[in-house]
């Protein structure tokens, strides 16, 4: 049977997913903090850090740990979906501090090679900031639940905040 649910209801359910919303909020705040750290530590305003990978803190770690924490908080930490979310979080964090970091270090060394070694001139240097140090992953993984759980507990779904004055039409009795 075909589901006749209106598409706006599906979109509303998607945007009303508190675990997803607060995981994304944790990711966004972690990414935004990179801009302020750049300003504080290097005394320069460089908005490009908002779309770059790597650096302090790991926004991907904040995303997956924030989402996993919300799933555990709402469904229970013994729920199979929390186990899945936690395993995905571990894989993402391992990848960020292991494989992606190694790829970035390799790119750094390749970029340091003299141009005379190449049969043709490279168009642009390889991207070096790919992964994270363990500290960057740790800070991101702590930021995730620290942002997502209070948001989930005290605010709930941000969609509910925007719809406080909007209610479903009621029919007169």
Name each model-derived stretch.
Residues 164-173:
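Single conserved hydrophobic/aromatic residue that forms the stacking wall/gate
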Residues 2-9, 37, 76-83:
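N-proximal short alpha-helices
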Residues 11-16, 41-42, 76-77:
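Helix-boundary and loop/linker segments of multi-pass membrane transporters
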Residues 1-23:
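Polybasic, low-complexity association/targeting segments
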Residues 22-38:
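N-terminal signal-anchor/start-transfer transmembrane helix
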Residues 28, 32, 47-163:
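Membrane-embedded catalytic cores of phosphoryl/pyrophosphoryl-handling enzymes
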Residues 13, 112, 168:
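Charged/polar, solvent-exposed surface patches and flexible loops
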Residues 38, 42, 46:
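Helix-loop segments that flank and shape redox-cofactor active sites
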């Amino acid at each position: 049977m075909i589901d006749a649910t209106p598409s706006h209801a599906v979109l509303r359910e998607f945007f009303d997913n508190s675990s997803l919303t607060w995981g994304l909020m944790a990711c966004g705040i972690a990414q935004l903090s990179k801009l302020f750290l750049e300003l504080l530590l290097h005394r320069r305003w460089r908005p490009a850090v908002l779309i770059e990978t790597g650096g302090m803190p790991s926004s991907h770690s904040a995303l997956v740990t924030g989402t996993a924490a919300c799933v555990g908080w709402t469904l229970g930490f013994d729920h199979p979906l929390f186990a899945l979310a936690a395993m995905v979080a571990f894989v993402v964090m391992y990848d960020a501090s292991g494989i992606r970091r190694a790829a970035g270090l390799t790119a750094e060394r390749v970029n340091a090679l003299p141009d005379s070694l190449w049969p043709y001139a490279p168009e642009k240097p390889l991207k070096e900031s790919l992964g994270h140090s363990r500290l960057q992953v740790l800070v991101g993984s702590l930021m995730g639940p620290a942002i997502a759980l209070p948001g989930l507990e005290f605010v709930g779904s941000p969609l509910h905040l925007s719809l406080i004055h909007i209610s479903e039409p009621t029919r007169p009795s």
